[in-house]
Amino acid sequence: MASVSSKIFAITGGASGIGAATCHLLARRGAAALCIGDLSNENMKQLEKSIREINPETKVHCTVLDVSSSSEVDKWVKDIISTFGDLHGAANVAGIAQGAGMRQIPTLLEEDDEQWKKVFQVNLDGILYATRAQVRAMKDSSSTSPGDRSIVNVASIASMAHMPDVFAYGTSKAGCAYFTTCVAQDVIPLGIRANTVSPGITRTPMLPRFVPNAKTQEEVEETYKKEGFSVIEADDVARTIVWLLSEDSRPVFGTNINVGACMP
């Protein structure tokens, strides 16, 4: 079992989907505290209740957070340190989707500036801001509380694909994976491991946003199955994230692990 007991974790985008599944698994395995940053206050309230049912001993610290704001992210991480005194691991899951299959070839001509900026601000800038703040906190904490520390950034199967659509999404996720690999080399001497997880087609509330023309969840999943992709659960991805956050995954760093469907 992955060793995360009695440790403090930060999770962006933790209120639903893969982020929530990660929080639930960390609580089951004895995490001391889960510090969740997400835009949805309502989802965080529901998540906090479910975590308390799983493990009443796990402390839950929820913050309404816009990861595209460096100042908000910096304050969030500083608050974690001031409240709990340490940060052992972080999973940066927050991201936004981009709908596919709605544009005429060449789809590039319909990739507008505002959409590009919005996707990058969350999917790549947000990764930079969160990772940077977490490394700063871990570096400072490790001098007084040495031990294995880990950051997991969530990209996507799109980071490995070359799709003639959703340019902003795919490029931002490829950037996330590349960035994390570079950070991994930079911080490993400090005892901080950084890795990427790239989920395949995952059954989450965000999945229908990738296929906006579909009328039902079943239609969304059938679209992907026809293209040769299997559909996995958020819990499947969470198990890999928690393994990377745990000491059981030492000395793994600088990887981009595909979970679920790979490119056919």
Curated annotation (Swiss-Prot):
Pathway: Alkaloid biosynthesis; ergot alkaloid biosynthesis. The active site is at 169 (proton donor), 173 (lowers pka of active site tyr). InterPro entries: NAD(P)-bd_dom_sf, SDR_fam. One of its GO terms (biological process) is indole alkaloid biosynthetic process. It catalyses: chanoclavine-I + NAD(+) = chanoclavine-I aldehyde + NADH + H(+). It holds the Pfam family adh_short_C2. Keywords: Alkaloid metabolism, NADP, Oxidoreductase, Signal. SUPFAM superfamilies: NAD(P)-binding Rossmann-fold domains. Its EC number is 1.1.1.332. NADP(+) binds at residues 18, 66, 132, 169, 173, 204. It is an enzyme of class 1 (oxidoreductase). One of its GO terms (molecular function) is oxidoreductase activity. CDD domains: SDR_c. It comes from the Eukaryota. Residues 1-20 form the signal peptide. Belongs to the short-chain dehydrogenases/reductases (SDR) family. Chanoclavine-I dehydrogenase; part of the gene cluster that mediates the biosynthesis of fungal ergot alkaloid. DmaW catalyzes the first step of ergot alkaloid biosynthesis by condensing dimethylallyl diphosphate (DMAP) and tryptophan to form 4-dimethylallyl-L-tryptophan. The second step is catalyzed by the methyltransferase easF that methylates 4-dimethylallyl-L-tryptophan in the presence of S-adenosyl-L-methionine, resulting in the formation of 4-dimethylallyl-L-abrine. Homotetramer. PANTHER family: DEHYDROGENASES, SHORT CHAIN (PTHR24321), ESTRADIOL 17-BETA-DEHYDROGENASE 8-RELATED (PTHR24321:SF8). This is Chanoclavine-I dehydrogenase easD. It comes from Arthroderma otae (strain ATCC MYA-4605 / CBS 113480) (Microsporum canis). The gene is easD.
